[in-house]
Design a protein with these regions (language model features):
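Active-site acid/base region of carbohydrate-active enzymes
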Residues: 127, 433, 479-513, 519, ...
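Short, well-ordered beta-strand elements
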Residues: 279, 664-667
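Glycine-/small-residue-rich "gating" segment that lines the acyl/pantetheine channel
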Residues: 595-598
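Extracellular/oxidizing-compartment recognition motifs
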Residues: 2-528, 540, 556-559, 575-580, ...
């Protein structure tokens, strides 16, 4: 007999398809269950969650995408009313889930898993367990990162035959495993509004080879979640390129040093007829971007080249890395700096350059200094924005204009006469000269699109990732037709409550642009931008919230953002700059602005409950700053002491006066909040603390100004 249900999971298990490991990179699963309902049911709800993202269907209808971002210690699941989606008789529930298995600055993946429970008239009618049918999805798993914040690049292979359904594997009971404190989502679901796309350009594209990306971090650490560490883990890939004749081919690359036959290349592959030993060296630590380096040959003749693994194994490349890098595998995600280990790793990376020539690979396999991988293939990376036209081509490019920037989910309908490949990407801006602002150029690094492989016939596909841009560019090969394209905008459901109008049309337009920009930066938290990062930066949140209060309200979004940031105190002694994030970096003035934002939320909303809910975190955040006060009474810490992208932000100073000044501002806000919480004892402590900071800071007030920092305790900085 079904168990009577509360508003949390009671019977459901975390499930997945059978895997050799459940922390592998970029894994997809489809799960479904049939269940029967009798006539006359009144109300139905579903509880659902996944690590890392999911899409829910009921009786073939897409219901929602989720979940919101969260820390694994404080999981937020979704609870939806699905009464209108169910029917008497047989029903089907289907969930597609994607476990990222990699570092990101918007999510913290820890273990593949999905969970669901359906409650009809307060009784459980279905829940995830081993009775569910599951199979691996048709998304390719061997893809590069889309960016450091948004997980793996999406590449769907509709040509794959669908796997047979298997029995699900039960991983954990609902409230066990690596996910803790399961509570319902604390902000509304995003909108689903259709946006019109207008075809504005069609052009032919040249034949060209793939863009090859190297998963160096995954090759070194094997278990990809270890790649969430900001630790050195570079290496070198080797291949033999067989050229049909002497040729020079221009190339682009990111991070890699490239040597051919022992000679370092700068912008051109200089190949001799026959065999050429090629080394791709990544001689720097991994970090936000450096563990996914790539290269691209920009010439149609690249298709004539053959690749052969010099080790004799299958796969295009072999790989080596310093064995010292492997010592990072069991370190915590944000370890103390180990100077000795870093030195050994960096020395090993430097020595890789001497191997940039034909070498006896048997020596490498026997090396005590290096680890050798005899064979690997680069990741699938079809995201190649074309930057020139060509008359003789095997592909056509179509560019669509949304009119203004948007963010959401793209759907395509493709009609192909034979097997074909489709590549889609989005951009924000095109200059008057027609130059496109691509999202991969210089140090900018975001594959803002997806790849799709389709068989002959009609294929319909809806991307699983939210993307942003104004222009949508689709490239298709062969006799292939784009039968349909749609953009479903997905943002926070704003309610217009403020307006602005004056006699200056320029100012009116500025208001409209600002309001639209804010709307695109409101989702399950405030975000820094809709395209590149979609990160929840605490300092940005404070400023965005102030604008939102007058324009849209958005109090619930601010409340959620404040709470999510407060939960970072499980990982650091001050509120972090960006949450949730695979490493816990602190920008002190943003830790302080969180306190200011809490006060401002109360002043605008009048909701004292949010203050009380976050009061313990507020006091912890303030009290822990005392451990960073030096003998001179100033805030002194080795953090990212940023203010506003000035020169001082990058100088590595421990003592910068704006930190102490902003801490004083946070104490001011805290004193005001003490009236709400009736915590007079803490108010007195904050008053005394603030007075001591004022005394310490004012020692450096000279000639009508404060210096940015103190070079030492006896003299002011020359930077003001």
């Amino acid at each position: 007999m079904p168990t009577r249900q509360t508003n949390n999971f009671t019977q459901a298990k975390w499930i997945w398809a059978q895997q050799p490991e459940y922390t592998l990179y970029n894994r997809w699963v489809e799960a479904q269950k049939e269940f029967n309902l009798s006539d006359g049911f009144m109300q139905a709800h579903i509880l659902v969650c996944a690590d890392t993202t999911y899409r829910l269907f009921i009786n073939g209808e897409r219901i929602c995408d989720g979940p919101v971002r969260f820390y694994p210690e404080h999981v937020r699941f979704d609870r939806l009313d699905i009464t209108k989606s169910l029917r008497a008789g047989d029903n089907n529930i289907k969930i597609i889930a994607n476990y990222w298995g990699c570092k990101a600055t918007t999510r913290i993946p820890v273990h593949a898993g999905l969970i669901a429970e359906i409650i009809v008239d307060n009784e459980i009618s279905a829940f995830t367990d081993r009775s569910w049918r599951v199979r691996n999805g048709n998304w390719e798993t061997n893809t590069p990162y889309s960016s450091f914040s948004l997980g793996p690049y999406e590449y769907y292979n509709a040509e794959k035959g669908e796997e047979s359904w298997q029995q699900a594997v039960e991983l954990f009971a609902a409230h066990e495993g690596p996910w803790q404190d399961l509570t319902p989502r604390d902000c509304p679901f995003l909108t689903a509004d259709s946006r019109e796309l207008k075809l504005v350009q069609t052009r032919k594209l040249p034949k060209r080879a793939y863009w090859y990306s190297f998963p160096f971090t995954r090759l070194i650490h094997k278990v990809p979640n270890v790649g969430a560490k900001i630790l050195p883990s570079g290496g070198a890939a080797f291949t033999t390129i067989v050229a049909p004749t002497d040729m020079e081919i221009s190339y682009r690359s990111f991070i890699l040093e490239i040597y051919i036959n022992g000679i370092k290349m700068e912008s051109t592959f200089k190949l001799n007829k026959g065999d050429n030993f090629v080394s791709f060296i990544s001689p720097r630590p991994n970090g936000f971007q450096a563990d996914d380096p790539w290269f691209l040959l920009e010439d149609v003749r690249a298709a004539e080249l053959k690749y052969r693994n010099p080790s004799g194994s299958e796969g295009m490349f072999c790989f080596i890395h310093p064995k010292a890098s492997e010592e990072t595998r069991n370190m915590p995600n944000h370890p103390p700096r180990d100077e000795e280990l870093q030195t050994r790793i960096m020395e090993g990376l430097t020595k890789l350059r001497r191997l940039a020539r034909p070498v006896d690979l048997k020596e490498l396999e026997a090396s005590a200094e290096y680890s050798f991988t005899s064979s690997f293939s680069p990741t699938i990376d079809p995201h190649i924005p074309a930057i020139f036209d060509a008359a003789d081509s095997d592909a056509t490019e179509y560019m669509y204009d949304l009119g203004t920037q948007s963010i959401g989910y793209i759907s395509l309908e493709i009609e192909a006469e034979s097997s074909a490949e489709v590549v889609l990407y989005m951009i924000e801006y095109i200059t008057e000269e027609g130059i496109r602002q691509h999202t991969i150029q210089g140090n900018t690094y975001y594959r803002n699109g997806f790849g799709l492989k389709v068989p002959a016939g009609t294929t319909k596909f809806r991307s699983m990732k939210r993307r942003s841009g104004r222009y949508v560019v689709v490239s298709v090969k062969g006799e292939t037709k784009i039968a349909g394209i749609e953009m479903e905008e997905s943002v926070y459901p704003i309610k217009a409550r403020g307006s602005f109008e004056c006699s200056d049309s320029y100012l009116n337009k500025l208001w409209e642009i600002s309001a639209r920009t804010l709307e695109l930066c409101m989702e399950d938290t405030y975000t820094d931008c809709p395209l590149y990062e979609q990160n929840f930066w605490v300092g940005d949140m404070r400023n965005e919230a102030l604008f939102a209060y007058n324009v849209f309200g958005g109090y619930d979004l601010t409340k959620r953002s404040l709470k999510l940031a407060a939960e970072s105190l499980d990982h650091q002694d001050l509120i972090v700059c960006c949450a949730p994030r695979y490493f816990t970096e602190i920008i002190p003035i943003w830790s302080f602005l969180w306190v200011v934002a809490l006060k401002e939320f109360y002043l605008y909303s009048g909701e004292s409950d949010a203050v009380l809910e976050n009061w313990a975190a507020c006091k912890t955040n303030i009290n822990n700053t005392k451990t960073y006060i030096n003998e001179e009474g100033l805030f002194d810490a080795p953090f990212w002491n940023m203010f506003d992208w000035g020169e001082i932000d990058w100088m590595g100073r421990r003592v910068v006066l704006f930190n102490s000044i902003m801490l004083g501002g946070a104490l001011d806000s805290c004193i005001e909040l003490c009236e709400v919480t009736e915590d007079q004892e803490f108010a007195q402590e904050c008053c005394e603390y603030k007075a001591s900071l004022i005394t310490a800071v004012n020692k450096y007030f000279k000639n009508g100004a404060y210096p940015d920092n103190t070079d030492n305790l006896n003299s002011g900085s020359q930077i003001t």
